[in-house]
């Protein structure tokens, strides 16, 4: 179960890390391409050399993720369970859902982590390992953010 004790302090650093990860992944093919979205995710890459500008664009990134929630869910549907698309999109989609569940929402109670159990049950056959890996990655980021939060 995730530790939400330092979630508020971790939020800022996690945003920075998530933005940095997205910028680093640009050009590798490991990113989401929204056909009907506003394109805000791509805006982050325009200011990769300026931390202030990156942080200013995090809001756009969050807005895009929120408004495209149905599309994110579609990414882990049967439509993407084959071939290259599965490898390209599934882990990223799982991470975005975890981001929505554990970071974007203001969760006060650790029992809210049960939502992850529902998600895992729904996609158990294919995505359990992917979601576990994404959850572990998010836990590690929160732990690192907690350790560094006093510097900010």
Enumerate the predicted regions with their spans:
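Short amphipathic helical patch at the helix-1/turn junction of helix-turn-helix
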Residues: 99-105
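Glycine/proline-rich, positively charged
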Residues: 94-96
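N-terminal interaction/assembly modules
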Residues: 1-86, 105-120, 128-152
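Ser/Thr/Pro-rich, acidic low-complexity intrinsically disordered regulatory segments
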Residues: 89-92
């Amino acid at each position: 179960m995730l530790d939400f004790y330092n979630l508020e302090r971790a939020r800022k650093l996690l945003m920075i890390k998530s933005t940095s990860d997205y910028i680093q992944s640009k050009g590798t093919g490991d990113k989401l391409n929204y056909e009907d979205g506003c394109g805000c995710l791509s805006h982050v890459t325009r200011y990769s050399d300026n931390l202030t500008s990156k942080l200013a664009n995090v809001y756009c990134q969050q807005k895009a993720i929120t408004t495209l929630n149905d599309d994110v869910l579609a990414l882990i549907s049967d439509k993407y369970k084959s071939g290259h698309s599965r490898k390209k999109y599934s882990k990223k989609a799982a991470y975005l859902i975890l981001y929505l569940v554990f970071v974007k929402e203001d969760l006060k109670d650790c029992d809210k982590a049960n939502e992850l159990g529902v998600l895992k049950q729904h996609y158990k056959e294919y995505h359990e390992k992917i979601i576990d890996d994404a959850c572990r990655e998010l836990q590690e980021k929160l732990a690192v953010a907690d350790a560094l939060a006093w510097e900010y």
